[in-house]
Amino acid sequence: MNNMLGYLRDYKRESVLAPLFKMLEATFDLFVPLVMADIVNVGIAAHDLHYILVRCGILLLLAVIGLTCSLTAQYFSAKAAVGYSTSLRHALFAHIQSLSFSEMDTLGTSTLITRMTSDINQVQSGLNLFLRLFLRSPFVVIGAMVMAFTVNARAALIFVVAIPLLSVVVFGVMVITRPLYKTAQVRLDRVLGLTRENLTGVRVVRAFDKEQDEIDRFENANDLLTKMQLHVGHLSALMSPLTYVIINIAIVALLYVGSIEINVGGMASGDVIALVNYMNQILIELVKLANLIVQVSKALACAGRVQAVLDTKPGLDFPAELRSEVPADKAGDAVRFDHVSLTYAGAGAPSLSDISFTAKRGQTIGVIGGTGSGKSSLVNLIPRFYDATEGTVEILGRPAADYPREALRGKVNVVMQKAQLFGGTIRSNLLWGNKNATDAELWAALKTAQAAEFVQAKPLGLDEPVEQGGRNLSGGQKQRLTIARALVGKPDILILDDSASALDYATDAALRKALAALPGSLTVFIVSQRAASLQHADQILVLDDGRLVGLGTHDQLRQSCPVYEEIYESQFKKGDVQK
């Protein structure tokens, strides 16, 4: 938690001035009851209008000064809280970018979004309230009691009895409701997670006619949240009547003692008014203090969750520069797996077991296998999205772990299964591959990816807007643009992870032909469920339950690999493979 306080270092001045100005405001507030008592005891008693007007002017001046101090304190506290949350959000976002796929899988997207938004907002609100009240409320409670004793020590003894009783009620309710508020926050996170899941998968929900099921699921979670919030609300609502009962009893006692003191000449009627005002000030500040503790408790709980993400160490350590030289006997290697195994965190069984193969520069490597056979797991090791649990992965003759992050990702570009585009334009999306690429290079990549024709047909061409997630493009168009984006970077190794699934056979064949015709020694890994897409590959890796059960050309595998032959025959009979 101390690490998170470091983000306040740029706002030390504001963090000091905010509570100080609040204490100044409280100081002026403490003088108000005395001035009011003076008006009653002197001005009204003597029927001195001038005296009354002067004291009213003093009250107005105190109000203006107090308001100025309050606004100044609010400005500084808001500046510190907003600046702190902004710095924290930037740091958290930057830290998330440094996490590997493994940590992202463990934490979960919904969790990270909640930490970035509602949790940091809660921390901001708690800090803002803390800076304004953590000194003011105790100062007013103590100050009001001291001022009460200056008015009349005997009557002020009622404060000595009332304040502990008020504290027991206020803080007792707080102690009871604090863990319940945490439970309510957990249930709120659940509702937010369900909402995000539903909105993300809204098309699937519609496709399977599951709207009512989703409504029922949401209502169940929302009902649990509502019940908890109502329960907490009912308990918190007890605070107001109980405290006002104590205050009213104390006020009655003050009036009784005050009347006796007035009769014997021990105090004036204005002093009773001052004591009642001090009692009300104490009540208000105790309620504020209890609310502050509840809000700060929520903020600390949220801060703890944010800190847990910040404490998550990136699982991959990238060197600052290349660590090794390429041996002469490996100069022609593009990718080499040497007895590689992979087990995901929390998984009981390995996803890959004892995989060994070598892909030469310029080769096209096909990867095929049934669902869950480990195809994506295998290609995700090449750009080092994950580290192998056992064995060694070598890229262009060097261990993958010897490359700096930028160097490795510059040499290996991946087109994921899900075609992900970002809001902007076609040009801005393509420039992710190489921010310095010229228009000629962009069009060349589009042509290779079989996307030039439909981009040229757009009214604005490269500057055609792309909505968030590419909502205004078809599945095939998005896939071709993501392939073009990868090609813009001119990588040494290109991985197509089932990223042509939305393309028809003709377009798929044209894409493979265009990739083969590219100059240089581009090595292409094609992950596909279609045997037809891989039959012209230089090598085909056949995976089954995480194991490499076949390695060779299409013709070789048909003779030697039963798994490949089964896949081929099943698709051929369905007309999914062309001879």
Q: Where do the PLM segments sit?
A:
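Transmembrane helices of ABC transporter permease
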Residues: D10, E14-T27, D38, L59-L62, ...
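ABC-type nucleotide-binding domain
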Residues: P327-K579
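Hydrophobic/aromatic residues in alpha-helical transmembrane segments
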Residues: V32, M36, A73, S77, ...
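Short intracellular "coupling" helices and adjacent cytoplasmic loop segments at the cytosolic face
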Residues: A46-H47, V82, H90-T114, S118-I120, ...
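Helix-loop-helix
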Residues: D48-V54, M147-V161, H231-R305, V309-L310
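An intracellular "coupling" helix at the cytosolic face of ABC transporter transmembrane type-1 domains
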Residues: D10-R13, S98-S102, S118-L127, L131, ...
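Membrane-integrated ABC transporters
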Residues: M1-F31, M36, I44-L60, I65, ...
